[in-house]
Amino acid sequence: TEGLVLRQTKYDEWDKILTIFTRNNGKVQAIAKGARRPKGSLVAGTQVFSYSDLLLYKGRNLYQVNQADIIESFFSLRAYATHIIELIDAGSVEEVPNTKLFDLSIKALKVLSKLNKDYKKLLVAFELKYISFIGYRPHIRSCVVCNNELHNKIRFSIEHGGAICENC
């Protein structure tokens, strides 16, 4: 299954416990045995920010990573990618698939890797889609106070749950 490694924790001498956001199973905890060995076959595909094709087996308490082939790494973008990954981790539930959020996350990281600037615009766009996908959709089509059409100067009101026109 395709997965994005969100977190890793050292476990024993050569192993690590991973939090992986997968397309098919949602967020899962998995053990990657030998993933900390310098020449281990799981090293690259189990790094944080790695988007990998994973062979996972469900154990009693954890999944086990038996194979990890890296599709793409977003390590060089770690400052911005960390923000995206933290949101995914906070907004996903263990073993509850959310393919829309998975696809959005991978797409955002791929676009981020190709940008030279305007990272903040991408992050804001991601955040707006993200909050919609996890069930919080702000009203941005018209003013939440008077329902008039929105023009150039608008403000966002957390209290009202959406955009407010310049007259309100």
Give each language-model segment a name.
Residues T1-C168:
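Non-catalytic alpha-helical scaffolds and adjoining flexible linkers that form interface surfaces
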